[in-house]
Amino acid sequence: LGIGGLPRGRVVEIYGPESSGKTTVALHAVANAQRAGGIAAFIDAEHALDPDYAAKLGVDTDALLVSQPDTGEQALEIMDMLVGSGSLDIVVIDSVAALVPRAEIEGEMGDSHVGLQARLMSQALRKITGRLSQTKTTAIFINQLREKIGVFFGSPETTTGGKALKFYASVRIDVRRIQTLKEGADSVGNRTKAKIVKNKMAPPFKIAEFDIIYGQGI
């Protein structure tokens, strides 16, 4: 990153295609924060956190505050409350795509919910970024890549949740699987590339490559 780790008091976005290693990278950051004596929270909007895997990466799962909210509003309210308490060092939101607004969950099929999630993210980030900075808490938002429909020029990929996160994030990390690692005929892991796409704290566009071994992490 060029600054010796993830910045405190800032928003970090880790994004990439499915199964690219985003959550693994975030859990390693949690483990490092805990090792340094920090308190960590994991807001599991995907309802997919595997405590055994997290423990293998060095996460103290007993000390990790885990919340599995039902709606996007609830997830962001919990985050705001935890950050506002001032006792947290790092919080991970997995993932932005799973922060579904209440109206969408309770609404009828076929109702138009265009822009609801983007508005929810924009309002929440406006409020939360100030608090993160005051309390020196690092927030990691994990985000999925989607294909934009009908794009002929430029990248057809886009992240979910509107433009707010792109704007408010101090660091954005693009994580991709570039190769499957094999031992004989068995797949044992993935070679992964992380590119710093935006960095307000140091020059961006640095690239790191590392291996993620199944069941063990980086």
From Swiss-Prot:
In its keyword annotation, does this UniProt entry include DNA-binding?
yes
Protein location: Cytoplasm
Molecular function in Gene Ontology: ATP binding; ATP hydrolysis activity; ATP-dependent DNA damage sensor activity; single-stranded DNA binding
**GO terms under biological process:** DNA recombination; DNA repair; SOS response
- Cite the binding residues for ATP: G16, P17, E18, S19, S20, G21, K22, T23
SUPFAM superfamilies assigned: P-loop containing nucleoside triphosphate hydrolases
Supply the alphabetized keyword list. Answer: ATP-binding, Cytoplasm, DNA damage, DNA recombination, DNA repair, DNA-binding, Nucleotide-binding, SOS response
Recorded GO CC terms: cytosol
User: Does the keyword Endoplasmic reticulum feature in the UniProt annotation?
Assistant: no
Note the InterPro entries from the entry. AAA+_ATPase, DNA_recomb/repair_RecA, DNA_recomb/repair_RecA_CS, P-loop_NTPase, RecA-like_N, RecA_ATP-bd, RecA_monomer-monomer_interface
Q: Where does it mainly reside? A: cytoplasm
Q: Domain of life here? A: Bacteria
What does the protein in this record do?
Can catalyze the hydrolysis of ATP in the presence of single-stranded DNA, the ATP-dependent uptake of single-stranded DNA by duplex DNA, and the ATP-dependent hybridization of homologous single-stranded DNAs. It interacts with LexA causing its activation and leading to its autocatalytic cleavage.
Task: Indicate the family of this protein.
Answer: Belongs to the RecA family.
Q: Which PANTHER family match?
A: MITOCHONDRIAL DNA REPAIR PROTEIN RECA HOMOLOG-RELATED, RECA
Name the record gives this protein: Protein RecA
The species is Paenarthrobacter aurescens (Arthrobacter aurescens)
